[in-house]
């Protein structure tokens, strides 16, 4: 399963390392934008969400969505290679 995770922390440096550590702990990932990742994991959406939101507070935001083909965008070749491999 591939999920897109995008987040916005009210205080940009607050908990960023913890949030990114949790996202990256799911194994295979690619960071696309400053606060947007794609991850490839066998974990459920609920498991990913529960772990990733643990460092957020009421002023922060996060969305996690399942990603399926087709997919379009403006990315580097390295990012497209990741998508082709895992999606």
Name the predicted role of every residue range.
Residues 18-24, 49-56:
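Short amphipathic alpha-helices in soluble, non-transmembrane regions
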Residues 13, 46, 73:
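Loop/helix-junction capping segments adjacent to catalytic residues or to phosphate/diphosphate-binding pockets
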Residues 25, 30, 73-75:
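Short linear sequence motifs
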């Amino acid at each position: 399963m591939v999920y897109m995770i995008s987040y916005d922390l009210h205080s940009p440096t607050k908990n960023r390392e913890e949030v990114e550590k949790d996202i990256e702990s799911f194994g295979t990932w690619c960071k696309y934008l400053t606060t947007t990742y794609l991850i490839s994991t066998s974990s459920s959406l609920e498991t990913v969400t529960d772990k990733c939101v643990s460092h957020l507070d009421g002023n922060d935001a996060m969305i996690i969505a399942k990603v399926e083909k087709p997919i379009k965008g403006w990315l580097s070749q390295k990012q497209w290679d990741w998508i082709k491999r895992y999606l």
